[in-house]
C-alpha cells in the first residue's frame, strides 16, 4: 500500500492543545460493527463486561527535555542497554554513568566531545548520527539519571502542542494515574482518560486488569517518508511482560474472554510477544510495524486516541479495525469536532473479523 492511502484532511483546530478539565470527561467514540456511539469516557464501564481483560502500559513519562544552553535543547529518546554503571571520581565520590540516545535541536551546533554542566553533573556528546540524533553520556554525582531529570528536565510535550510555555499541570496530566516504571519519553496517551475511580468501578464489575511495559521512544513522532510503506523502518522500543501477566492473558485467551489493549503501545507489546496465540513473558525490544494484512493473535479490542494522517499508528488502526472503516470513522469524528492526538478524545475499536 502507498503512504497516500493513509492520508486525510484534519482541521488544525481539532488538535487538542490542553487536557480537558477532568480526565474521564473526554469524549469516547464506540466503533462497533453496527454503529457509532459518541459518549463520555466515564461511560466506558457500560461497554465492558464481566470477564473482559484490560491490558494497560504502566510506563511512566520521564522529564526527557533538557536545555543544554539557551540555544540548544535535546529530547531523550532511549536508554542504551548494558551501558550504565556506577564508578568513583578522582576524589573517591560515587559517580553514576548512563548512556542515552537523543534528538538535538539544532544538532549542527553540537560536536562530539562537547560537555555541558548542570551543577556538579555533566553531559557529554559521544556520537552524532543522522536526522538530528545524537548519543550522550551522563556523568552524575551520586544520583540516578531519573533523579537528575526530575531536577533539571521538562516534561516532553509533543511539538504539535503549541503553547507559549509549559504548564505545571502537564507534569500530572501528561502521565497516567497508574504509571510506575520510569522510561517513556512520550505518554501512552490512551491511558490518560482513566481515573482510579473508573478502574475501581471496572474491577467491581468483574473486569480484570493487567499491566505490560513499553517505554515509548521519541521515534513514535517520526514521520513516514517513503511512499511505499513497506520501505519504512520502525524504531525499536523496550518492552516487558512479567510471567504473572502472561499467565493472566493466556488464561483469558483460553477461556475466550475479550482482551482489550489500552493504547497502541499495549497492543504492540502483546502482538510482538504472541506465538501461536499465546503471550510469552520476558524483556525484549520490538520494532513491530503493523499495517493492513497483519494477523492479530492476541488483542480483540483496542482503546486508543485519534492519530495523525499518514502515521504508523493510523496504519495500525486501519489494520486492526479495517481500512475503509477507519477512514469513515475518522471522517465522522472530524464532523463531530472530536479532539485529536495526545490530549484528545478516545475511540474503542473492535478487531475486524
UniProtKB/Swiss-Prot annotation:
It comes from the Bacteria. Keywords: Cytoplasm, Queuosine biosynthesis, S-adenosyl-L-methionine, Transferase. It is found in: Cytoplasm. SUPFAM superfamilies: QueA-like. Coiled coil: none annotated. GO terms for molecular function: S-adenosylmethionine:tRNA ribosyltransferase-isomerase activity. Pathway: tRNA modification; tRNA-queuosine biosynthesis. GO terms for cellular component: cytoplasm. It is an enzyme of class 2 (transferase). It holds the Pfam family Queuosine_synth. GO terms for biological process: queuosine biosynthetic process; tRNA wobble guanine modification. It catalyses: 7-aminomethyl-7-carbaguanosine(34) in tRNA + S-adenosyl-L-methionine = epoxyqueuosine(34) in tRNA + adenine + L-methionine + 2 H(+). Transfers and isomerizes the ribose moiety from AdoMet to the 7-aminomethyl group of 7-deazaguanine (preQ1-tRNA) to give epoxyqueuosine (oQ-tRNA). Monomer. Belongs to the QueA family. This is S-adenosylmethionine:tRNA ribosyltransferase-isomerase.
Amino acid at each position: 500500500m502507498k503512504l497516500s492511502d493513509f492520508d486525510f484532511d484534519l482541521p488544525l483546530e481539532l488538535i487538542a492543545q490542553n487536557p480537558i478539565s477532568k480526565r474521564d470527561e473526554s469524549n469516547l467514540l464506540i466503533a462497533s460493527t453496527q454503529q457509532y456511539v459518541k459518549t463520555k469516557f466515564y461511560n466506558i464501564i457500560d461497554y465492558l463486561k464481566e470477564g473482559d481483560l484490560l491490558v494497560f502500559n504502566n510506563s511512566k513519562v520521564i522529564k526527557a527535555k533538557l536545555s543544554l544552553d539557551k540555544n540548544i535543547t535535546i529530547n531523550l529518546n532511549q536508554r542504551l542497554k548494558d551501558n550504565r554503571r556506577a564508578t568513583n571520581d578522582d576524589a573517591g565520590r560515587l559517580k553514576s554513568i548512563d548512556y542515552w540516545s537523543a534528538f538535538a535541536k539544532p544538532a549542527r551546533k553540537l560536536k562530539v566531545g562537547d560537555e555541558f554542566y548542570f551543577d556538579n553533573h555533566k553531559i557529554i556528546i559521544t556520537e552524532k548520527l543522522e536526522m538530528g540524533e545524537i548519543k550522550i553520556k551522563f556523568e552524575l554525582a551520586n544520583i540516578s539519571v531519573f533523579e537528575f531529570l526530575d531536577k533539571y528536565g521538562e516534561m516532553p510535550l509533543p511539538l504539535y502542542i503549541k503553547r507559549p510555555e509549559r504548564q505545571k499541570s502537564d507534569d500530572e496530566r501528561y502521565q497516567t494515574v497508574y504509571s510506575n516504571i520510569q522510561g517513556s519519553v512520550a505518554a501512552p496517551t490512551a491511558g490518560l482518560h482513566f481515573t482510579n475511580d473508573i478502574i475501581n468501578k471496572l474491577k467491581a464489575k468483574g473486569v480484570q486488569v493487567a499491566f505490560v511495559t513499553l517505554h515509548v521512544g521519541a521515534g513514535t513522532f517520526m514521520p513516514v517518508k517513503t511512499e511505499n510503506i513497506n520501505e519504512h523502518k520502525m524504531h525499536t522500543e523496550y518492552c516487558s511482560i512479567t510471567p504473572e501477566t502472561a499467565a493472566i492473558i493466556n488464561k483469558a485467551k483460553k477461556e475466550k474472554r475479550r482482551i482489550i489493549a489500552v493504547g497502541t503501545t499495549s497492543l504492540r507489546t502483546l502482538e510482538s510477544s504472541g506465538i501461536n496465540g499465546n503471550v510469552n513473558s520476558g524483556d525484549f525490544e520490538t520494532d513491530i510495524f503493523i499495517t493492513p494484512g497483519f494477523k492479530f493473535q492476541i488483542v480483540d479490542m483496542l482503546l486508543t486516541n485519534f492519530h495523525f494522517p499518514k502515521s504508523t499508528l493510523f496504519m495500525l488502526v486501519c489494520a486492526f479495525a479495517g481500512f475503509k472503516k477507519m477512514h469513515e470513522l475518522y471522517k465522522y469524528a472530524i464532523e463531530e469536532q472530536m479532539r485529536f492526538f495526545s490530549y484528545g478524545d478516545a475511540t474503542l475499536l473492535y478487531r475486524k473479523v
